[in-house]
C-alpha cells in the first residue's frame, strides 16, 4: 500500500499569552488545512500529534515555522497509509503534562541533560546507570528499553511519589529517563534534579527520535512503541524485533491492544482476537457481566450466547 499520509509528533515549551484564544484560532487553522489530530495548548506551550496528507502536513509545519514562538519546533515524522485520527481537536489545559506537583517545574529553567540517541545508548550500557521509563504502565508493557525500570504506576502523575518511595535505590546512580516524544521527560527530569539527583539525563526527542536515528537504529529497544492514535503500536528497533508484550489472559507473546469492554473500567490490555472473543472483551468476570459491555453490544450477542460463553469459560478456568 502507498504511504500517502504522515503523522507529525511535536511539542514546544514556550510562553503563550491567552492560550484559550490561541487554541480556538489554531483549531480553525488546522481544520482549514484539513488535518486530523489532537493538540493541547497551555500557557506554557503546545503539544500535538496531527495527521494528514503530505501536502497538508507540509502546510502545517510551514504555518508553525512562520510563528516566531514555534520556529524552532522539531517535528517527528512518520509515514502512514491513512489518517491516524478521525477528528481534529485543539484543547486548552492548565499545563501540558500533569505531574500533580504543588510547585510545578518550568523546563525552560530546569531540566535534565539532553542526550542524543548515540549518547543515550552508550549511557544505558554503563553499569552505574539506571533507566527509568516515564510513561504509563500499559505503554511500558508493549515495549521498552532493555533493562529499564517499570515504575508501578497507572498514570504519569503518580511518578513523583513512586520515585520518593524508591529514592534510595537511585540516589547514587546516574539516572536516565525517556518517554514517547520527550515532553514528559522535560518536566520529569527537571523535577529529579530539584529532588537532589546529581546526574540526570533525558533522551532528547524521545523514543520516536531514537528509532529513526540512522546510526543507533533503535538498538536495545524491545517490543513496540505505544502511540496515542489509531496505529496504537509503532516499530522502533530496526535490527531485531523482540516481543515483550504478554496477553492479559494467558501470558502468551502479544502486541495487540484492546480496551476492556466495560466502559467504566476501560483498562487497556494486550489480547489476541481469540482471547478477546473467549473472555467477551473484558478484563474480569465483573466486567464481562457488566450491562454495558461494549464487546457484547458490538457483536450483537444474545443473552443466551453470552451465558453459553460464560459457562464454557468457567468450565475452562476450572479445569
Curated annotation (Swiss-Prot):
How would you classify this enzyme at the top EC level? Answer: oxidoreductase
Molecular function GO terms recorded:
oxidoreductase activity, acting on paired donors, with incorporation or reduction of molecular oxygen
For this protein, what is the EC number? 1.14.-.-
- Residues annotated as catalytic: 179
Q: Which reaction does it catalyse?
A: uridine(34) in tRNA + AH2 + O2 = 5-hydroxyuridine(34) in tRNA + A + H2O
Rhodanese domain: from which residue to which, for each copy? 125-219
Keywords of the record, alphabetical order, are:
Oxidoreductase, tRNA processing
Q: Which InterPro entries match?
A: Rhodanese-like_dom, Rhodanese-like_dom_sf, Rhodanese_C, TrhO, TRHO_N
Name the Gene3D superfamilies on file: 3.30.70.100, Rhodanese-like domain (3.40.250.10)
| SUPFAM superfamilies reported for this sequence | Rhodanese/Cell cycle control phosphatase
Among the record's GO biological process terms, what is one?
tRNA modification
* CDD domains the UniProt entry points to: RHOD_YceA
**Keyword hit for Zinc:** no
Q: Which PROSITE patterns match?
A: RHODANESE_3
Q: Which family does it belong to?
A: Belongs to the TrhO family.
Which HAMAP family does this chain map to?
TrhO
List, alphabetically, the PANTHER family matched. Answer: RHODANESE-LIKE DOMAIN-CONTAINING PROTEIN 7-RELATED, THIOSULFATE SULFURTRANSFERASE/RHODANESE-LIKE DOMAIN-CONTAINING PROTEIN 2
Primary role: Catalyzes oxygen-dependent 5-hydroxyuridine (ho5U) modification at position 34 in tRNAs.
Q: What name does the UniProt record give this protein?
A: tRNA uridine(34) hydroxylase
What's the source species' lineage?
A: Bacteria, Bacillati, Bacillota, Bacilli, Lactobacillales
